[in-house]
Amino acid sequence: MAKKSAVNRNERVKKLVKQYAAKREALKAIANDESLPLEERFEARLKLAELPRNSAAVRIRNRCEVTGRPRAYYRKLKMSRVSLRELGSHGLIPGLVKSSW
């Protein structure tokens, strides 16, 4: 199991990302629009820099839903390889069959 503090921190980051997503997207659109004057684009970049760091989507860490493990994460299943193997061997994941050849 991952530390609860690390899992909770990641949840707080997810919440911040969701909260600032629209504002961040609007500022990025202004900053990248080459038809606007340079000063206006620069202002948008400054406002973007003033937003909280944790409001950027790249700060989110994919974590296992079962254990909170941050590494060896399968995106489709939202779990780590360890949890996948454990739950799969008990037959708790629908459609997952042990390979044999």
Curated annotation (Swiss-Prot):
Assigned GO CC terms: cytoplasm; small ribosomal subunit
An example molecular function term from Gene Ontology annotations: rRNA binding
Domain of life: Bacteria
Matching SUPFAM superfamilies: Glucocorticoid receptor-like (DNA-binding domain) (SSF57716)
Keywords: Ribonucleoprotein, Ribosomal protein, RNA-binding, rRNA-binding
Record GO biological process: translation
InterPro entries: Ribosomal_uS14, Ribosomal_uS14_bac/plastid, Ribosomal_uS14_CS
Family membership: Belongs to the universal ribosomal protein uS14 family.
Stated role: Binds 16S rRNA, required for the assembly of 30S particles and may also be responsible for determining the conformation of the 16S rRNA at the A site.
Self-association state and partner proteins as the record states: Part of the 30S ribosomal subunit. Contacts proteins S3 and S10.
HAMAP family per the UniProt record, alphabetical: Ribosomal_uS14_1 (MF_00537)
PANTHER family (alphabetical): 30S RIBOSOMAL PROTEIN S14 (PTHR19836), SMALL RIBOSOMAL SUBUNIT PROTEIN US14M (PTHR19836:SF19)
Record's protein name: Small ribosomal subunit protein uS14
Lineage of source species: Bacteria, Pseudomonadati, Pseudomonadota, Alphaproteobacteria, Caulobacterales
